């Protein structure tokens, strides 16, 4: 029984590290996918008020 404990503990430890790395990579991919949408929203927030002001100036 003692001879099996060390390899099983090592296997569990390596699997835990692997799972943690996979989670970090998946989170990074999700963040990369979310960024363009957030950038578009920021651009729209900056762009629309400027267009509104320009239209109001030309409309007068």
UniProtKB/Swiss-Prot annotation:
Official protein name in the record: Temporin-MT5
Gene Ontology CC: one annotated term: extracellular region
Propeptide boundaries: 23-44
Function: Antimicrobial peptide.
Endpoints of the signal sequence: 1-22
Organism listed in the record: Amolops mantzorum (Sichuan torrent frog)
Tissue occurrence: Expressed by the skin glands.
Domain of life (superkingdom): Eukaryota
Subcellular location: Secreted
């Amino acid at each position: 029984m003692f001879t099996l404990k060390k390899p099983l503990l090592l296997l569990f430890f390596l699997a835990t590290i692997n799972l943690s790395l996979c989670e970090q990579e998946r989170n990074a991919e999700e963040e990369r996918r979310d960024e363009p949408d957030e950038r578009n929203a920021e651009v729209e927030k900056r762009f629309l008020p400027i267009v509104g002001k320009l239209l109001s100036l030309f409309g007068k």
